[in-house]
């Protein structure tokens, strides 16, 4: 068991491994175990208070017409390149995401568009994903029950751009990387 309690050595009779950021570690491990499929795909992450779903669907349609099969993970469900799966979360946890990316790779989807919630960014559910594009739709007063103030909320959203910057600095960079910000709102 991987967790953030340094006082434990075992839990329920199983070995307990302390980790300061267990969700991040679990995501990195899960992606590594399935061969890091996002290193071979173009990953477009879309964040913002409103407009993520519409932007994701429009982007998916453009990519499908110009590049072929394209997956879409978001609020309404997960399109695995023609097969729909119900979505328990807008952005699933790292272990589930790794399995989804592997599945869409098997289905010959070279591009994946995904909504990336501020909760997922804050909770490091997207650790291990090699993003090529970060898109930001807008920021309005929502989810302040979780983030407490607008500054903290914005910092969570900007983590998606930090992930693209990580990819830009990576020795294993796999395609162009850039950010898109909606300046109209």
Regions found by a protein language model. Name each.
Residues 67-81:
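Short beta-strand-centered segment that lines the nucleotide-binding/catalytic pocket of NTP-utilizing
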Residues 52:
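Conserved lysine of the Walker
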Residues 16-18, 43, 70-72, 134, ...:
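Conserved beta-strand scaffold positions in the cores of enzyme catalytic domains, especially
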Residues 88-117:
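Conserved nucleotide-sensing/catalytic segment adjacent to the nucleotide-binding pocket
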Residues 1, 29, 46, 73, ...:
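Residue-level signal for inorganic ion chemistry
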Residues 3, 7-13, 122, 131-185:
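Acidic, Mg2+-coordinating active-site environments of NTP-dependent enzymes
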